[in-house]
């Protein structure tokens, strides 16, 4: 009850992780990707 999500890099446990939580670490010249607090998906940074 009250679940926001069931799976995803920004979902744990059944709640969206708060905005600013790192969900994908930077690789090479890329930047870290962060949860947005409203989705279970990990949005890509605008510079990928």
Curated annotation (Swiss-Prot):
GO cellular component entries: extracellular region
Location(s) in or outside the cell: Secreted
GO terms assigned for molecular function: toxin activity
Short sequence motif Cell attachment site: positions: 27-29
Keyword Secreted attached: yes
UniProt-listed InterPro entries: Disintegrin_dom (IPR001762), Disintegrin_dom_sf (IPR036436)
SUPFAM superfamilies membership: Blood coagulation inhibitor (disintegrin)
Ranges where the Disintegrin domain occurs: 1-48
Top-level taxon of origin: Eukaryota
Known tissue expression: Expressed by the venom gland.
Database matches in Pfam families: Disintegrin
PROSITE patterns: DISINTEGRIN_2
Keyword list, A-Z: Cell adhesion impairing toxin, Disulfide bond, Hemostasis impairing toxin, Platelet aggregation inhibiting toxin, Pyrrolidone carboxylic acid, Secreted, Toxin
Modification Pyrrolidone carboxylic acid, positions: 1
Disulfide bonds: 5-11, 10-35, 23-42
Role played: Inhibit human platelet aggregation induced by ADP, collagen, thrombin or the thromboxane analog U46619 in platelet suspension with IC(50) values of 66-267 nM. Acts by inhibiting fibrinogen interaction with platelet receptors GPIIb/GPIIIa (ITGA2B/ITGB3). It also inhibits angiogenesis in vivo and in vitro by blocking integrin alpha-V/beta-3 (ITGAV/ITGB3) of endothelial cells and by inducing apoptosis.
Additional note from the record: Negative results: does not inhibit the binding of specific monoclonal antibodies to alpha-2/beta-1 (ITGA2/ITGB1), alpha-3/beta-1 (ITGA3/ITGB1), and alpha-5/beta-1 (ITGA5/ITGB1) integrins. The disintegrin belongs to the short disintegrin subfamily.
Similarity section: Belongs to the venom metalloproteinase (M12B) family. P-II subfamily. P-IIa sub-subfamily.
Subunit structure, interactors included: Monomer (disintegrin).
Protein name: Disintegrin accutin
Protein's organism: Deinagkistrodon acutus (Hundred-pace snake)
High-level lineage: Eukaryota, Metazoa, Chordata, Craniata, Vertebrata
């Amino acid at each position: 009850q009250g679940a926001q999500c069931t799976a995803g890099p920004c979902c744990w446990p059944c709640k969206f992780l708060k905005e600013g939580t790192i969900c994908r670490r930077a690789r090479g010249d890329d930047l870290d990707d962060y949860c947005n607090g409203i989705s279970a998906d990990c949005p890509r940074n605008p510079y990928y």
